[in-house]
Amino acid sequence: MSKIIDEILSSLSRSRIFRNRELLLPDYVPEELPHREEQIKRLVEILSPLMRGEKPNNIFIYGLTGTGKTAVTKFVVKKLHEKISNSFIYVYINTRQTDTPYRILADLLENLGSKVPFTGISTAELYRRFIKKVLELKPILVIVLDEIDALVKKHGDDILYRLTRANYEMGKSKVSIIGITNDIKFVEFLDPRVKSSLSEEEIVFPPYNAEELEDILKRRATLAFYDSVVSDDVIKLCAAIAARDHGDARRALDLLRVAGEVAERDGAEKLTIEHVNKARVEIERDRVYEVVSTLPFHSKLVLLAIVIGVNEKRRTLTTGEVYDVYTKLAKKIGVESVTQRRVSDIINELDMLGIITARVVNRGRYGKTKEVNLAVNEETVIKAISEKDSKIASLWDR
């Protein structure tokens, strides 16, 4: 067994594919951000009051995944801080990871130098301490809240209301907020008071086109790979695939990185179209696994009902048929089933995630119905459900 490990490690150590793999990872912020000059300029203009020691307006940054929102924000704030570090301090928080109001306030306090116990203090007390700490500061505090929609959908917008009210409560303009979201419609669901405070300035990041993605990939490939490893054809294919997926630069970079890893495992000296196609399958499998494994319990059960029903009937299912299979599964594992209306909503949600297809069809005098089918690899779905939910996994033992 150790011989196999030694052989693999030896092969990888001889690889001449990657010069620096980390330059292709999502959290890497390059020194150049091509095709985002307009957004960089706009963000610098909005934040320019910091040069005078004044609080800039709050900013909402919109754009689909992989359009450069986070990279540009981190880049601009970091560069400004290098030039005028005495004027402001900044804290970056990804609210999908730091996903409760308590942890957000705790993170803010810890970044400002205060120690916070993991539990035992109320959110209200944390907020009081936060206000007190900010008042002690001389510089302006810039708070970057990334994926802000994830937080609000889970816990509401009370924490945003508190943060936007902080300046009023202190009697001083000390806190500026930059909110970043993938959901362009998200702001419509905010309390009007939060909406007006947060949306003082707005910047929209459009998707990249294929030519822009090619340029981004070429620049990054020059740094990340050894010379002559990546051909123009490989770059063009990665860019074309990502351009079809709403111009997602993150997807393009992931595709190029995973293609390099596939080539490395194959012992190849160069990346090929075949490596890109293999990487595409691998990434899609990983994406499906991640999405399915994090679904709520009843969404997983409905999805499993679709898998079982389609296999049994050898055809697409109606919404009613999905509900019938779902209720039988719920009864088997001893859980109370949700209503047919809720199952219909779950089907729509799974369709939006791209896990299933739900097509409305007209059946004449029988009226309209939905034809439901699985849109991804069945084995990956079953693996994600069974490994992440023991209660549903018990169905396999019955």
UniProtKB/Swiss-Prot annotation:
<dbReference type="InterPro" id="IPR036390">
    <property type="entry name" value="WH_DNA-bd_sf"/>
</dbReference>
<feature type="binding site">
    <location>
        <position position="220"/>
    </location>
    <ligand>
        <name>ATP</name>
    </ligand>
</feature>
<keyword id="KW-0067">ATP-binding</keyword>
<dbReference type="GO" id="GO:0016887">
    <property type="term" value="F:ATP hydrolysis activity"/>
</dbReference>
<dbReference type="InterPro" id="IPR003593">
    <property type="entry name" value="AAA+_ATPase"/>
</dbReference>
<dbReference type="InterPro" id="IPR027417">
    <property type="entry name" value="P-loop_NTPase"/>
</dbReference>
<comment type="similarity">
    <text>Belongs to the CDC6/cdc18 family.</text>
</comment>
<dbReference type="InterPro" id="IPR055237">
    <property type="entry name" value="Cdc6_lid"/>
</dbReference>
<feature type="binding site">
    <location>
        <position position="208"/>
    </location>
    <ligand>
        <name>ATP</name>
    </ligand>
</feature>
<dbReference type="InterPro" id="IPR050311">
    <property type="entry name" value="ORC1/CDC6"/>
</dbReference>
<dbReference type="InterPro" id="IPR015163">
    <property type="entry name" value="Cdc6_C"/>
</dbReference>
<feature type="binding site">
    <location>
        <begin position="67"/>
        <end position="71"/>
    </location>
    <ligand>
        <name>ATP</name>
    </ligand>
</feature>
<keyword id="KW-0547">Nucleotide-binding</keyword>
<dbReference type="GO" id="GO:0005524">
    <property type="term" value="F:ATP binding"/>
</dbReference>
<dbReference type="Pfam" id="PF22703">
    <property type="entry name" value="Cdc6_lid"/>
</dbReference>
<dbReference type="InterPro" id="IPR036388">
    <property type="entry name" value="WH-like_DNA-bd_sf"/>
</dbReference>
<comment type="function">
    <text>Involved in regulation of DNA replication.</text>
</comment>
<keyword id="KW-0235">DNA replication</keyword>
<dbReference type="InterPro" id="IPR049945">
    <property type="entry name" value="AAA_22"/>
</dbReference>
<dbReference type="Pfam" id="PF09079">
    <property type="entry name" value="Cdc6_C"/>
</dbReference>
<dbReference type="GO" id="GO:0006260">
    <property type="term" value="P:DNA replication"/>
</dbReference>
<dbReference type="Pfam" id="PF13401">
    <property type="entry name" value="AAA_22"/>
</dbReference>
<protein>
    <recommendedName>
        <fullName>ORC1-type DNA replication protein 1</fullName>
    </recommendedName>
</protein>
<dbReference type="InterPro" id="IPR014277">
    <property type="entry name" value="Orc1/Cdc6_arc"/>
</dbReference>
